[in-house]
Amino acid sequence: MNAIGEVAAFGTAVCWTLSALFFEQGTKRIGVLGVNFYKVVFAFVFLACSAWLLRGMPLPLDASPETWLYLSVSGVIGFVITDIFLFTAYKTIGSRMSTLFLAISPAFTAILGFIFLHEVLAPKSLVAMGLVGTGIVIAVLSRERIKSGLAAKRADARGYVFACLSSIGQSVSMIFTKQGVKNYDAISGTKIRVMSAIIG
């Protein structure tokens, strides 16, 4: 079981990396809103097919009203607002630096979980947050040293803000997802989020 989880985690990391590269190129060609719309539409189609094959139910008709509420809010925040911030950051500072900022999302999620869900923050989690934050600061400062011109630095600053906002948005979305999905099917739960994003 641990091996399956490790393979899944590795596969997720690979997919995240590839998708970031594709999204960066897409935003430069058709814009942020275009990429975001096509992303959620394709996601809905694939999720519907997956749910139909695995559960025999292409639409999440068995979800409770509470599940619909939490996951719909999560979808709008995560797949609309957050991804608009993220894709704008891709377009401004590139996928490499933007993805680096996403590394602080688990830290924001842990803090929000502590505040709203009363989850416990272990000391090693606090140390990890500090290390990640330090790494991001070093990367940003290194990039600033090789940049020349006020306009370029202002564009970078704007990109950093959008990347940070996307990280925070992802964390807020995750808190709503935790509350909504609980024991519900993960694929169908994600489909609710995607459906709300298409409407939103």
Could you describe each region identified by the protein language model?
Residues 26, 35, 39, 89, ...:
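Hydrophobic/aromatic residues within transmembrane alpha-helices
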Residues 41-47, 101-115, 130, 195-200:
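Alpha-helical transmembrane segments of compact multi-pass small-molecule transporters, enriched
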Residues 30, 93, 119-121, 184-185:
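Membrane-helix interface residues
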Residues 4-12, 51, 58-81, 85, ...:
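Loop-to-transmembrane-helix transition segments
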Residues 11, 38-39, 101-104, 123-127, ...:
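Hydrophobic core positions of alpha-helical segments in small-molecule transporters
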Residues 1-34, 45, 150-195, 199:
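Glycine-/small-residue-enriched transmembrane alpha-helix faces in small-molecule transporters
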Residues 59-65, 102, 109, 113-138, ...:
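Loop-to-transmembrane alpha-helix entry segments
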Residues 18-33, 80-96, 138-151, 200:
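C-terminal ends of transmembrane helices
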